[in-house]
Structure formats: C-alpha cells, structure tokens
UniProtKB/Swiss-Prot annotation:
Gene giving rise to this polypeptide: rsm28
Keywords on record: Mitochondrion
Region (Disordered): 20-71, 168-229
Name of the featured protein: Small ribosomal subunit protein mS46
GO CC aspect terms: mitochondrion
Known partners and oligomeric status: Component of the mitochondrial small ribosomal subunit (mt-SSU). Mature N.crassa 74S mitochondrial ribosomes consist of a small (37S) and a large (54S) subunit. The 37S small subunit contains a 16S ribosomal RNA (16S mt-rRNA) and 32 different proteins. The 54S large subunit contains a 23S rRNA (23S mt-rRNA) and 42 different proteins.
First-listed, main subcellular location of the protein, grouped into a coarse class: mitochondrion
The organism's taxonomic lineage, starting at the top: Eukaryota, Fungi, Dikarya, Ascomycota, Pezizomycotina
Family: Belongs to the mitochondrion-specific ribosomal protein mS46 family.
Residues making up the signal peptide according to the UniProt record: none
Transmembrane segments: none
Amino acid sequence: MNRQVVTSTLGRRGVASTILNAQQQQRPFSSTTTRCAAEDDSKKPAAAPSTPRAAAPGPISASRQKSEAAVGKLTQLRGSFTSLTNDNSFHKTLPAGARDARRLAAAPIAGKGAGAGAVAPLGGGGGASGAPKVINVRSLKGTLGSRGSNNIPGAVAPGAALRPRFAAGPGAAAGRPRFGAAASPGAGPTGAARRPPFGARRARPAGDKKRSGGSGDKRPRGDDYDAPPTEEEKAFLRGLEQGKVTEYVPKLTPDTLLGYGPPVATDAALGKVESAMRTMRILGGGLPFNDQSGVTSDPTAIKHRYVHEKKPVFFSSVEEKEWVRESLDKFAVSEGPEKKTKQKILETSVLGKYEEPKYVESLTETVKMVEKYQGGTFSYAPSDADKFNKKLNQLLAAGLPRAAPAPAQAQKKA
C-alpha cells in the first residue's frame, strides 16, 4: 500500500485508539458511513475526561471514517503477512549502521502533550505516566534505502538524509524530470532534461520560421520550385495574350526563288534560266530542285549513279555538292566530262541547239525516216537512239536479196 496513506493515517490525532480496538477484536471491512458510525457508538466504552477542560467528542467526520477503514485493512494485511513470513526474520542480524523500524521506540510529537485527543501508539501501552504516544514518521530519517541499488532495502548509513523514491542520481541538475538519469559531475542539463513534457511541442530554434502561414519566405522543395518569370518571358506572354505590333520585313527575293520558277520559253532572263535548270535536272536523274543540302539527295544513290552507271549527277547548289563529298568516304566528284562533251550538253540543253530533221522523199529510206522522228521528240535519249538504229540496220540487212553467184567457168578461167 502507498506510504503516503500510512503516513497520513498514523499522523492523525484520535486514530490510535481505534487501532487498539481493531487489534483486540477485528471487524469486517465496510465503507458504509452509517454502519461505521453505529458500530463505533455501540462498541466504544465511555471514558471519563482526564481534565476538567476536555470537551465532549463531536460527531464522527467523513475523513475519520475513511481513516478507520484504512487502518482496519492495514491490520488485516499485517496479520496475513506475519503468518506467511518467517518469524526468525525479526531476529536476523542487520548490517552495520542499519535500523529496523519495528524496534524504534515511540516518541511524542513536539508541542503536543497528552490530552483527550492523544492516542496510544500501535504497540499498545503508553509511557510511565500512561500518556499515549504517537510515532512521527518525519523523524525517522535514514530508515528507507534507495530502491534499485545494491544495498539492502530499508538500510542506509547512520545520519544519512532521506532520499525520495524516484529522486535523481547524484550530480543531477535542479528541475530535472521525475525519472531523469543522473548527470555527470559539473555537466549541464542533458538531453533528457531538455526534452519537453509528454504532449507538448518542442520549441523552435531562434530564427526558424514556419513554412506556411509565417512572415518568412517559403523554402524551395526541389522540382516543385518554380523560378519567377523573367522580363523577356513576361513580354512574350503579353504578346500572346494581347498581341503586338511588328514591322513586316520581306525575305523572298528573285534570287531565293531561282530554281522554283516555271520553265517557260520566253525572252526574259528568268524563263531561260528555269528552262536550262529543268533540262539539267532531267539529265541528272529528274530529282526536284531544292536549295537545302541533304533533303532530296541520297549520297548512296548519287555514288552508284556516278560511279557504276556512268551517268551525270545534278546538284542544286555548290553547298549540296560539298555535302555529298563529306558524306561519302573516299569519293571525289570530278569536274565532269571533257570540254567537248560539256559544250555539246550546253548547246543542246541550254542554248537549245539540235540537229534539224532531214526531209525524206522516198518511203524506202527507212533509216533516214526513223532518224527524223527521233530528232523531233524527247522520248529517245541519244544512247537509246543508237541502240534502236543498230537493231534496225540488222533487220534491214537480213531482208535484202543476196547477189547471184558467178558461173563455174568464169571461176576456172580466173
């Protein structure tokens, strides 16, 4: 049972007499106020006042009834504990400097004499004068040892001060928690002493502000942080929403349109250039014109056409020609065919010179008639026309009548 209950019970006046009656005749424990009052009035003998000035006892208060009930319970517990323990423990030898509370003599409380309110101690029987005595628990210093130590419980050094049950160890600072650990000598408060109580918030360090709701700026959180827009970005956004006035600067010129015009047979310079470029593109494979290098040109196809097929290649610009050279390893584009061949191509494709078809009067001149039609159309290239004429001559030679052989006599004479 809690030691505070025992202290408050033994320290009250007028309770020791009830303890004596409880030792002589135990009664069942009951917390009913009416029953306790009836039993006290019926069983308590009438005592004559010891002094003329002693007043008659008043009615029993509620606190006294609770105290009497607690004393009765203590008496029952004491009897059961004594029967269970070994009686020889009372005669055991205690360590040096130790005291046993059971062998202490009762001493009256200072300033209080024997009177009507005084009662006898727990052991029964008073002093020589018969005055009751009460044990003052506060005067029993050094009788309770520190729990959890290696010493025997209840034994301390003589004259040592009473230490509370959950007192801090030596060297602990004042104001420590109830269950705080001992601090090293000369050291300040430890982490346990600085820990806030249970349920309380820890104090923020100086200068630390809340992230939300405070006056300080919010801290950036990695990828979620967006930098404020610059002046250029703001101007761009305003232009998208509200529009802006810009000056029109034309970028198209006649030179930039060169190569995209129609090949019209006119006396204008632009028409002649477009016609010449169209003819050259057809001779180079018929690729469309493009002034951007690498858009319509395939370096592999150009190399195969130029090296293996021995055909001309047309480049839309000088930059495209250089790009093809850099794209193909160990491939060098020559300056072109011989000067005679270049002049022939220039006269035929650019200047528009061609061989005039000849008029054939007789339909029997088949070869000349075919050459006439080949010169008036672009369906046959010069190489294709040569192949066609060669085959035609073979067929015509096979259809000619053979010459008659010479007579045998003439051969003999010869």
